[in-house]
Amino acid sequence: MSRTSAGELDVLKVQLKTWERQFLEENGRSPIKEDIKAHPEIRRKYKEYTSLKKLLSKGNAAVTGQKHGSPSRATHPTPQKHIDAEIELGPTPQIYGKVVSLFEMHISPLKKVPVRQLDADSSETCISPDLHSQDVAQSELLTDISCQAKRQLDFSVTPHASPVKAVQPLLLNAPDLRFEAIPHARTKYGPNSPVKFDGDVTLTLSQTPLQAKLAQASEGYSPSPLIKRPAKPLSQLAKEYEDIVEELKEVDHAAAVRNLGGLLQQEEENTQEAEAAEPSATRSDRKRRKNKVRPALVTLEEEIPQGNLHEQLVKLRQKALDKFNGNDPNDSSDEEKKTSATSAKPAKARKRKYNTVSDNFRRLKLPTKNTRNGRWRRR
């Protein structure tokens, strides 16, 4: 069925393509839907071609679905491991019902350490045959103990430091010295002690080359000036000290003069403010009512200096000059008393009036002598 339909589809496709080319050569354009409807035979072939193409596409889809379908696989459960009986652990460290102590630990068996045979003509120190036989016997004994099922620990305390060895003085011209491992370490310490040296460990000490210091000291030139210590002579240091002392004196004098000038200027400002604060007697009562700002009450008694500071300084200078010239200071004191008596004037007691609240308002705006209201003049 599928082969015949595929062959018919190919035949119809060839027939339709030949007709389309003939139509293109005759009319100069490709056929459209109206041209196909005008030829019933060609229309029937187009319908048959589309139906066969649909059948072939459905058959191919069914075949591909069967081809890629995965068969059902049988599920095999994962085999479970054999579960041993649960191990019960109590409050004390134990395993399999047996109490475990710190001394019952599993230690791996010791390995046999091969002993290197040293030649007679070698530069290294050789071990005596008695010590060698003793080491071999001890290693065999340790291997026999390790093969047993249980072991008993040695309770001897292992030292925390290596033994002290008497160091021999080294000669400068001696050749390179090579020390073999300490032969007594095998007999004194256990096989697993960290202090024990193996048989193939060697320590090499080489001679440090000496520098020819005497040859350098015998050279006939002076050292570089950069290496010398940068120091000043005592005369220069004394001169710098005197300059610093003079500068400090000048600074102190300038500060004292500046402070005196500031005090004099502040005194003049205070006197000007006091003169400006005194009320004038020619002011009218109406203008006084407008000024409602009153000074605050004085809580602390301020110490006001008596007299003018500038005048006092002038007097002191005059006294010093009179004393230097040999004049009598009593005459100057009498003059000071006269000037102080004339300058001291009795302070006038100012009468203060208690202003009521009603004084802030005016009931009628009547004409007065000092008013400049023009509306009363026009009547």
From Swiss-Prot:
The keyword Glycosyltransferase does not apply. PANTHER family: DNA REPLICATION REGULATOR SLD2. Has a role in the initiation of DNA replication. Required at S-phase checkpoint. Belongs to the SLD2 family. It comes from Eremothecium gossypii (strain ATCC 10895 / CBS 109.51 / FGSC 9923 / NRRL Y-1056) (Yeast). This is DNA replication regulator SLD2. Gene3D superfamilies: 1.10.10.1460. The lineage of its organism: Eukaryota, Fungi, Dikarya, Ascomycota, Saccharomycotina. InterPro entries: DNA_rep_checkpnt_protein, Sld2. GO terms for cellular component: cytoplasm; DNA replication preinitiation complex.
